[in-house]
Design a protein with these regions (language model features):
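N-terminal pre-catalytic "stem/leader" segment of glycosyltransferase-like enzymes
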Residues: 1-52, 251, 299-303
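Conserved catalytic-core segment of nucleotide-activated headgroup transferases in glycan assembly
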Residues: 9-20, 119-123, 130-176, 185-196
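A charged, aromatic-enriched C-terminal amphipathic alpha-helix characteristic of glycosyltransferases
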Residues: 15, 123, 253-303
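Active-site proximal beta-strand in glycosyltransferases
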Residues: 49, 57-75
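Membrane-proximal helix-turn-helix segments that form the acceptor-binding/catalytic region
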Residues: 75-96
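Donor nucleotide-sugar binding/catalytic pocket of nucleotide-sugar-dependent glycosyltransferases
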Residues: 92-125
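Nucleotide-sugar-dependent
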Residues: 142-145, 192, 206-224, 234-244
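A short alpha->beta transition loop at the rim of the catalytic pocket in nucleotide-sugar-dependent
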Residues: 202, 229-230, 236
């Protein structure tokens, strides 16, 4: 059996790692998550699958996959992309989230590549008619993502509406808003438990800044909201508009300051949620041809 190391920094939320382990493991391949290891002996592995990041030096002579699940963020994001393009070592295979990500990195070589968009775990495909909260937000809670705009709205204008916040907020954010009775912070929740909690809300908030690179990338949480059949309130940006059109879904759009977020308008809005079972992880991974790509890498290296 060949051992494949799924190597990440441990900082990012990467549901795709569990999907790879669940759907790509077989009698020939064992996938190991680096986040579950204390120390790593790279010599134990037959293939290194890296979630990028930077990778300037090749330290072991085994095949390497570079996965670019997102573009660089923060200050000088495009410059960071350029540095990665120029200085990252050349892998045997690259995986890109979508065409937008591939185009922005603009690697000028003939390394094989595949696209692997985000999928949704089976556990999110539930419908819960017992609603205990008005709104839910799942995901990153940072100043950079502008999450305080949402919290300010519910602390003041929407203080009669309950808001369930699933995830780990930055300490200063939690310290400021924990006193508001209508804002409920769950803290970090096990991934498989999220749908049971989140589905108790009537509306789900997808709050993505309309700025590079966030507006080009797939919103994992929005996909999970759709799978749970929640009524979705979202900011207006490139990717979400393309997805809405492609799937024939209808979301309630808000601006960054949430001025359009009014309960009376939501009650009158004709939400349209459709089936996205074609975006289950097993279906997404079938489309990528990843299994055959891995087989070919291993075959070339070890036969």
């Amino acid at each position: 059996m060949k051992k494949i190391l799924l190597l990440s920094s441990g900082k990012a939320y990467l549901p795709e790692i569990e999907a790879y382990k669940k759907y790509l493991s077989n009698d020939d391949y064992q996938f190991v998550d680096s986040r579950e290891l204390g120390t790593i002996d790279f010599k134990e592995f037959d293939l290194i699958w890296k979630f990028m990041g930077i990778d300037f030096h090749k330290t072991i002579n085994v095949p390497i996959i570079h996965e670019y699940a997102s573009l660089s963020t923060g200050n000088f994001a495009k410059a960071k992309n350029c540095i990665k393009r120029v200085f990252n070592i050349r892998p045997e295979l690259r995986i890109f989230l979508n065409e937008n990500v591939k185009r922005e990195f603009n690697f000028n070589d003939n390394v094989p590549y595949v696209y692997r968009d985000m999928g949704v775990d089976d556990c999110f495909f539930i419908k819960n008619d017992n609603k205990n909260y008005d709104f839910v937000y799942v995901g990153e809670m940072s100043f950079e993502r502008g999450i305080t705009n949402i919290l300010e709205k519910f602390a003041k204008e929407l203080n009669t509406q309950s808001l369930l916040m699933i995830g780990e907020p930055e300490k200063l954010i939690y310290a400021k808003y924990k006193k508001f009775r209508n804002i409920i912070f769950t803290g970090r929740v096990n991934y498989t438990e999220v749908p049971q909690i989140a589905s108790q809300a009537e509306y789900a908030i997808n709050y993505i800044p309309d700025k590079y690179p966030y507006n080009l990338q797939t919103s994992t949480k929005l996909l999970e909201y759709v799978a749970m059949n929640l009524k979705i309130v979202t900011t207006n940006y490139k990717w979400v508009n393309e997805f809405e059109k492609e799937k024939g879904i209808k979301f309630y759009k808000i601006s960054q300051d949430l001025k359009e977020l009014m309960p009376q308008n939501l009650k009158m809005f004709n939400f349209n949620i459709t089936d996205i079972s074609d975006m289950k992880w097993v279906k997404v991974l079938e489309k990528t041809n990843l299994k055959s790509s891995i087989n070919e890498l291993i075959r070339r290296e070890y036969e």
